[in-house]
Amino acid sequence: MADRLDPILPGSYLGILGGGQLGRMFTHAAQAMGYKVCVLDPDLNSPAGAVAEKHIQADYVDHAALKEMASICQAVSTEFENVPAQALDELEALGVYVAPTSSGVSVAQNRVAEKKFLATWKDEAGIGPAPHLVIEHDSDITHVPDDLFPGILKTARMGYDGKGQVTVHTREELSQAWEKFNRVICVLEKRMDLDFEVSALVVRGHDDQVVAYPVAENIHKSGILHTTTVPAPSISSAQEKKIVEAAKAIIRRLDYVGVLCVEFFVLKSGDIVANEIAPRPHNSGHYTQNACVTSQFEQQVRAMARIPLGSTELVQSTIMLNKIGRAHV
């Protein structure tokens, strides 16, 4: 097996857990650079599996499938944050270079862990999360401070694109919402006086090289990304610098290798709060395929292959419209 510091050369197999649209875009980027791709996804007709050199159709924690993937691939990554962390652990135990590792991904898989991480490293990152409280027992609802209302109740796991969250204005609404979520562990987050939302896309290599794309300003409709504008038109240069430095601090503190996106809220007061971490190429970064020297997907390939990261230079101002199929509206 090659040394963990050696570059992985074109012609080698790179693996991706997850066969959706992000995996498909990653596959095209890897193939354009001369790599082969193995996709593990349970869907026979997965978008990435359809274009990859090899598609292993199996559950993400299928031991035989993971062993087969490990025998083929020099490095493996994940397409989305809800791939079980144990799959990444098992692949690493089988001797495969995994980027990012489960330790970084698992923080973003659980909103409780994510909020704790962001709060713990607030001083280092310079930006922390919104005021919040973990809801795990009936007594937690009783002891919610009044100033957390109105708030947004979010399930700790499996929430994305506006799913797994609801706005609550009173303790009674909170109790009812928690019942509808089947009393799973949740986070109640104070609803902030939001001015606009931005995302910071950063990439870290195995050698601790970190590069950042220009901060993007996002508009969501029904919890789903609608448009992304780059450069972000509403932030000051001081705010952008603070956001980029926070994202760089977060990716280093997670010891994370690969592409990572941090979403931030800019409040009407001018304050900034960290909303969430996405441990993968991000929808708001799709514009990089046409507007930057190096796309976010090529950067993911470079990080996995342990080769130098590319330039994040923006070659033209961009407004991206996120169009999705009717089945997902």
Please annotate each region the language model reported:
Residues S102-Q165, R171:
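A conserved helix-loop-beta module that forms one wall/lid of the active-site cleft
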Residues K241-V262, K268, A278-R326:
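Active-site "cap" helix and flanking loop/linker of ATP-utilizing ligase/carboxylase catalytic domains
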Residues A64-A65, A87, S139-H143, E173:
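Short acidic active-site motifs
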Residues M1-K116, T120-W121:
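ATP-binding N-terminal substructure of ATP-dependent carboxylate-amine bond-forming enzymes
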Residues G164-V262, V266-K268:
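Internal nucleotide-binding/catalytic subdomain
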Residues G270-V273:
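Conserved protein kinase catalytic/activation segment
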